[in-house]
Regions:
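Extracytoplasmic/secreted cell-surface and envelope-processing proteins
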Residues: 1, 148-150
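Amphipathic, hydrophobic N-terminal targeting peptides for secretion and organelle import
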Residues: 1-36
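Short low-complexity stretches enriched in small and charged residues
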Residues: 10-15, 36, 73-74, 90-97, ...
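Short beta-strand edge/turn micro-motifs at domain boundaries
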Residues: 22-28, 151-179
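Core segments of small alpha/beta cavity-forming domains
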Residues: 33-110
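Hydrophobic core residues within well-ordered beta-strands of beta-rich domains
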Residues: 52, 137, 154-156
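A mature extracytoplasmic/lumenal domain signature
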Residues: 95, 124, 141-145, 156-158, ...
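Surface-exposed, charged secondary-structure patches
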Residues: 101-146
Length: 179
């Protein structure tokens, strides 16, 4: 009986030892970019125009975060292009897209600009129509950019189109009239 108790005690100590986190082990910091890169749009594509533009905004915010590294920028660029309409993707190679993006990010970082927050049109403000180009939606994204202590708002108007799988894809965007 005493031998059984001893064996159980040794087993409990062993289990506790292997399940105790190592205080010296490297910890992985979960950044916004890391979280964004774990998303799988093939399995869980955003369902509405607003959700697609929200994903675009989240990725954009990650691009300009100083903690986002070069490999993450490439991965985020891949993700962003999954939100784009085929015609938009066809207008620029991936390499050109990433080169242009990195150049813009470098300018933002050198000027210490940061996207602090954003807002997307409410669902009731999304305009939808069907015409010879397909089913389209128009909505707005406002990026709040912190620049030298001030917050500057950049308002963009987005055009999205449903593809053959009924996924909303970004056809393009332009700077909107600033109010």
């Amino acid at each position: 009986m005493g031998l059984v108790i001893l064996a159980v005690a040794v087993l409990v100590i062993f289990i506790l030892a292997i399940n105790t986190p190592d205080k010296n082990a490297d910890t992985v910091k979960i950044t916004a970019a890391t979280k964004q890169l774990t998303k799988n749009y093939a399995k869980d594509y955003p369902a509405t125009p607003k959700a697609v533009v929200t994903e675009y905004a989240e990725i954009t915010k990650c691009f300009y975060d100083p903690e986002t590294n070069e490999d993450q920028i490439t991965g985020l660029a891949t993700q962003m292009r999954q939100l784009f309409d085929d015609e938009l993707v066809a207008n620029q190679s991936f390499d050109d897209f990433v080169t242009s993006l990195r150049s813009e990010i470098a300018i933002y970082r050198s000027e210490e600009k940061l996207i602090s927050s954003y807002s997307v049109s409410s669902s009731t403000d999304v305009k939808q129509e069907t015409n010879e180009y397909g089913t389209l939606a128009t909505l707005y994204l406002t990026l709040n950019v912190r620049d030298d202590g001030a917050i500057n708002k950049i308002k963009e108007q987005f055009l999205l189109r449903q593809d053959k799988d009924r996924h909303w894809k970004i056809v393009g965007w332009v700077l909107a009239d600033q109010e």
